[in-house]
Each structure stands twice: as C-alpha cells, then as structure tokens.
C-alpha cells in the first residue's frame, strides 16, 4: 500500500509539473519569443529625435514616421526614476517586447528535414536530364554507368571482349545494367559521374594539363604495332571450326542474356545470330566458320570491330549515305559457304583448302527476328560433311541468282570473295549488274570447295546458257574417295 500511495503522489506531482510547463509555454508564446536574456537598460537622459516634418496633408498622428510605442515607454519611465540602474530587468519594461526590432518577433523559421538517402541515389536523382546520354560498360575492369563519353571511351579502349551501349536516360541505363548483372549473378554496376574523374585536390588540379594549353612539342613514344586486318584469309583451323559448330548446336534459350546470341537450327547445322552487346571475338570466329546468318549491331558498330575492314567500311558508308537518322539500327544478313580442309578424308589436315565466300546484305532493322534456341544433336558423320558442303555451295549459287533477278539493288562493295549490297528505291545501274556478273563468274566453279564435285558440276551445267555451256576446269581429275566414318564429338576430343 505504501508503494501504491507513493506512485499516486508521483503521478500527481508530474501532472502539476506538466501544467506548469504548459503555462510557461503559453507565456513564452504570448511574449513572442522562446529565447531568454537581458536587454540594454533604458537611459532617460538620451535625447529623442524630433518627429520628421510632415509633407502629406492630414493630422500629425497619421505620419507613418512617428515612433509611438518607444516614446510612451520612455515618458512613463522617466517619471519613475531619473537615474538609470544597471540591475533593471525585462519585467520593468513590459510595454517593450525584448524582440521588438527582430524580424517575426524572434520566432525562428523551422528548417526542412534533409533527405538522408544514400549518396549514390542522390547522384542518380540529380542527373535526370533528358538531353544527356548515359553509357553502360557491362564488363571489364572499369564496368559501370557513365554520363560522359570521354570517360566511357577510356574505360573500353583496347580492352578485348568489353561490351557497352548508349542510352537516352538514366532509367534505361540502370535497367539494362541490372538485367545484365542479375544474369551474371554479379554486383550491381555503380554510377560513375563525370565529376568524379576530374581532379579532386588542389595538387592534382595543378598537375592536370589544361585542354586549351598550346603544345610546344610531343614526346617520342615507342609505337606499339597493332594487329593487322584479319581480311578474308584468316588463320582458321579445323579445331576452331568444330568448336563453333558444337557451340551453336548446344546453345539454349537461357544463354541469350549472357551470350547475346540465338540460333536458327537446321537438321545438320545451327546458324548463329548476334544482337547488340555481343562478343566481337565470337562474331569473328563464327564469321570465319561460315556459320553466321544475322548480326544486329549497336549504333556504334562495336560488335563489328574485329571483322574485315572492307566489311566495316561498307557498313559505315551505308549508315552515312543511306540513313538520315543516325540512331536507327541496322542488320547484316549473311549467306556463305562453309570452309573445307585439304585431304579431308585422309588425315584431316588443319590447313584450309578453301575458305567461305560471302553475300552480305545491309539494311535498316525493324526489330530482331528472335526465336528461342534449342539444343540440337552435334553428331555428323565423316562422309556427311562433303554432302553438306556441296549443298551449301549450291544454295550460295541460288542466292546469287536471286540477286541478279532483283533490279532494285545497290552494290556497295565487291571482290572475288565477298559481295556487299543493299536494297534501293532506284533501279540498279550497269556498274551494279557488271559487279554481280563478275562475282558470279569468280565463284561458279568446282574450285569453290577445293575438290571436284559431281553434284556442283551437274547443277552448273543445268543453269548454263545454251550458247555458253559450263566447262569444269577439274573434270577428269580423280575424285577423293570416302574413308571410315567418324563423329564431330570424336574429332573435337582428339583436337583438344
């Protein structure tokens, strides 16, 4: 019971304390200030300035320059005492608020609460500019999201296999980066603003060379020779071909996000199709194997950077002269033969007997014609390869005939290995027709496969004109006989 009474007394005391605090709060609010302090004591002997001369018509009491409160207080106090005391307090001058001359009577304006979000989110919120481009570097040692092309270019320059892409806003860039990192089970890519790449200290700023400074000369550096153009006769052995062949047969739908590739599957061969941000080295190896069907490059064409120079320059020429909008995407449709190897049936020599020929169409893309990849059986018997190569050669001849029948066509480039063309609203010229006919005459021969083929001879004889029958240059030579059968799986394991 004693503890109970003690608690009741404490509650009553706290209630009284609360009431007293409320009264004190009301008093502070009525006085117009929450601050406590002393003011200067009033000096009655100080001279009061006269009321300024009134220039407007009316009574003197209406003059806005007259001091009303202060003189009344001064007059009242002067009667009470003539000698000022330094110990007077605020209570003796209740007519004058202590914050009389302060704005809002000394009431402080409340400050807005600051946003305590992370610094990275603040940086991303502060860069929402619709006119600014963002660059996502997906992989490599400097992966991240950049808002300055100069910095992004340094992060991708001379780094093999790096993938990057430009976006119009931060949301698209962040979404694409997150999709990639989630598929790779990696860490979230960081946003790297251009400001972080500038000098961060005074010493660094002093040592940084201004861009507008006049140069008095250039130091001599040792020139590092770059790799020569791969051209259309690259080093390509049987092991590399079988690896690409098996890769295409084993590609599945779930690999699209990581490899940026899908396949068009046939009975014996799967043709690879590459979209933006795909690996340039993979595109090059598949191109040399003759197993590429479509390429959908980015606007910066970084996926094509390892392909032969004549192909890259032709694509750049098409973009410059045939497309007004530089942001439009394009496609490359490739039709080719497959490579053949010397003495294929008697030992499988790695040296290539004859490399693929190519027909490349360049056009404006209306979207990726995507179809999911399916895992296919990667077993081809030894005697089947000759038949497959002959069938692909005949399909190649048929594709040339289709180009000849199309009158609205423009030839971009042509030599004895490749024909690059595009559709045109205008009819083809005589120069275009001559280029197609010359290319047809170069490839329409049994030497296309490096050995004699009765099937190709029969096809060319049927398609030859009446006045110009086809004459096989290798007719009468011995045809290579078939050897024992083998599978691609066995060959791949042997070469490894």
Swiss-Prot record:
It is found in: Host cytoplasm. This is Transactivator/viroplasmin protein. The lineage of its organism: Viruses, Riboviria, Pararnavirae, Artverviricota, Revtraviricetes. Keywords: Host cytoplasm, Translation regulation. Enhances the translation of downstream ORFs on polycistronic mRNAs derived from carnation etched ring virus. Gene3D superfamilies: Ribonuclease H1, N-terminal domain. Belongs to the caulimoviridae viroplasmin family. Residues 102-128 are annotated as: Disordered. It comes from the Viruses. One of its GO terms (cellular component) is host cell cytoplasm. Residues 111-128 have a biased composition (Basic and acidic residues). It comes from Carnation etched ring virus (CERV). The inclusion bodies are the site of viral DNA synthesis, virion assembly and accumulation in the infected cell. GO terms for biological process: regulation of translation. It holds the Pfam family Cauli_VI. The keyword DNA-binding does not apply. InterPro entries: Ribosomal_bL9/RNase_H1_N (IPR009027), RNase_H1_N (IPR011320), RNase_H1_N_sf (IPR037056).
């Amino acid at each position: 019971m004693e503890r109970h009474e003690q608690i009741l007394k404490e509650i009553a005391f706290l209630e009284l304390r609360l009431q007293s605090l409320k009264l004190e709060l009301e008093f502070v609010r009525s006085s117009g200030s929450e601050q406590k302090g002393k003011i200067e004591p009033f000096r009655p002997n100080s001279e009061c300035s006269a009321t300024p001369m009134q220039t407007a018509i009316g009574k003197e009491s209406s003059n806005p320059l007259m001091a009303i409160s202060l003189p009344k207080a001064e007059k009242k106090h002067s009667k009470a005492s003539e000698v000022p005391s330094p110990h007077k307090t605020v209570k003796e001058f209740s007519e004058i608020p202590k914050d009389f001359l302060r704005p809002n009577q000394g009431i402080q304006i409340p400050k807005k609460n600051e946003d305590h979000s992370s610094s990275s989110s603040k940086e991303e919120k502060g860069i929402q500019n619709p006119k600014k481009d963002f660059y996502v570097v997906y992989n490599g040692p400097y992966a991240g999201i950049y808002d300055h092309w100069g910095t992004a270019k340094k992060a991708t320059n001379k780094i093999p296999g790096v993938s990057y892409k430009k976006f119009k806003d931060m949301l698209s860039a962040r979404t694409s980066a997150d999709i990639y990192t989630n598929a790779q089970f990696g860490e979230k890519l960081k946003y790297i603003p251009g400001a972080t790449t500038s000098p961060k200290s005074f010493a660094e700023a002093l040592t940084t060379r201004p861009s507008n400074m006049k140069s008095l000369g250039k130091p001599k550096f040792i020139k590092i020779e770059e790799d020569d153009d791969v051209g259309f006769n690259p080093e390509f052995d049987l092991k590399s071909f079988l690896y690409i062949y098996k890769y295409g047969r084993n590609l599945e739908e779930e690999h699209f996000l990581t490899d940026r590739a899908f396949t068009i599957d046939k009975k014996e061969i799967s043709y690879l199709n590459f979209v933006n941000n795909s690996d340039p080295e993979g595109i090059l190896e598949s191109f040399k194997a003759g197993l590429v069907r479509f390429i959908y490059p980015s606007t910066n064409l970084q996926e094509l950077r390892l392909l032969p120079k004549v192909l890259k320059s032709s694509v750049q020429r098409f973009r410059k002269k045939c497309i007004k909008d530089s942001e439009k995407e394009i496609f490359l449709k490739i039709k080719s033969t497959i490579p053949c190897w010397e003495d294929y049936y008697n030992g499988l020599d790695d040296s290539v007997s004859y490399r693929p020929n190519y027909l490349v169409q360049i056009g404006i893309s209306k979207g990726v014609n995507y179809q999911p990849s399916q895992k296919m059986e990667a077993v081809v018997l030894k005697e089947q390869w000759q038949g497959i190569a002959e069938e692909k050669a005949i399909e190649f001849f048929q594709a040339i005939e289709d180009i000849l029948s199309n009158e609205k066509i423009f030839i971009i480039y042509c030599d004895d290995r490749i024909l690059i063309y595009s559709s045109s609203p205008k009819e083809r010229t005589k120069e275009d027709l001559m280029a197609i006919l010359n290319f047809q005459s170069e490839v329409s021969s049994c030497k296309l496969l490096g050995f004699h083929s009765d099937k190709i001879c029969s096809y060319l004889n049927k398609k030859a004109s009446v006045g110009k029958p086809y004459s096989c240059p290798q007719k009468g030579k011995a045809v290579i006989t078939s050897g024992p059968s083998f599978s691609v799986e066995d060959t791949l394991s042997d070469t490894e």
